Structures are given as structure tokens and as C-alpha cells.
Amino acid sequence: MAFVLTFFPFLSFILSPIAIMVHEIGHTVVLWLFGYPAIPAFDFANGGGITMSDLERSPSAVWAWAIGLIALGWWRREHTGTLVGLGAAALAYFWMFNSTRETLAITLGGHAGEIAFGALFLYRGLTGWGCRIELERPLYAFLGFMILFGSMRLGLSLLGETMEKHWYLQGKGGIDNDLVTGAQILSWRLESAARALIFFTLLAIPASFVAASMRKHIGAVAEAEEDL
């Protein structure tokens, strides 16, 4: 059903607000990570969504992340793996901070958000983690597949000379679309960016199944499994 809704435009329009919002939440999260206050919203003027931000960095937000990272490191100080992960995250953050890499992360954060939410919803559908009633599981799985299929559909539409590609290249509100900007930053062709999107979207599906098979090790299981 998710496949049908994805590849039939009229039907995909019905649930498109969900994909739009998770896309904008992705941008919002990355903006906040780098200290830019932002709010996800629907764009009623030009269609789709928009992430509202004045792109003025807030030093207090950056310091809040730093303090949080230090506090988490202190709390988990006896777990070497956690400390290594936090150290790697801090190095990656400073490597990207206030650079073209930061701009790239913000630009592609929307598509990363779609893939992350799609994988998370699929994981919840497979495991029942966080579900109160059994009916939630197929709904989460449906939403996960719908978001991921939608991401793949966009990537596939940009590989050839399609009408969707023509409209995508027009941008929105005088601003280039995310993959166009990302390709320019990376000095890639748009088709290469589209292939990367397809690859990471496809990767999210088996990754969700692998994570589900390791759910007890991860610690994110359904309530019924918690006491087993």
C-alpha cells in the first residue's frame, strides 16, 4: 500500500504533509545543532515546507550543547565505548563548525531527516518499541515505507530527463532545492546527488531490519519483551 501511495501522485498527495514535516524537522535539528534557532513550518505561499531561521548563531545554544556533551560524558565515564563515541562526535562537530561542511549538513539535513524518521518508524513497526496498542505497528511500518519510498522516488525522478527534474531545477521562491545546492557544494552533478540519496535511502531499510534483530542488545524493545 505504501508503494502504491508513493508512485501514484494523487494518492501520495494525501499523506505528503507527513513527509514534508519530517523533512523540515531534519533541517531544524541540524540548524539547532550548530546554534541557529529554527522552526519547521508549512510553506503556504510556495507549497511544501520551509524551515524558518534568521541564520544568526546563538552562542548560548552552542554552549548548551557543549555542556550537555560534557555532562553526558561524566555520567557515562565508566563506559569507554560511549566516551569514544562522544569524542568522535565532538571532533566531527568542530571539523564542520562554521565551514562549508556546516552549510552542506544544513542543506542536506532535510533528506537526512526523512531517512532517519523513515528508518525509525520502520524499526518501531518491526519491534513494537514505544507502541501502546498492536495496531500502531503496521501504521508505523506503513509510514516508514511511505517516507523511504518517497525519498527514492525523488532520487529516481532526477536521474533522467523527466518533468519532475525540470520542476525541481526551477527551485522554489527563488531558492534552489536542497539536492541542487548540495551538488553545487560538493562539485557533483545533480544525478550523482540523486544516486547518493537513493543509496542511503535503500541502506536504511536493511539497517532497520538489522537493528530490529538486535533490539534486545540496543535496549529498545516492546513492553511485552521487557520482562522476558
Task: Please report, for each region that a protein language model flagged, where it lies by residue.
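Cytoplasmic-side transmembrane-helix entry/capping segments in multi-pass membrane proteins
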Residues: R77-A90, T107-I115, I133-A141
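Active-site scaffold of zinc-dependent metalloenzymes
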Residues: M1-I14, T28, W32, A66-W75, ...
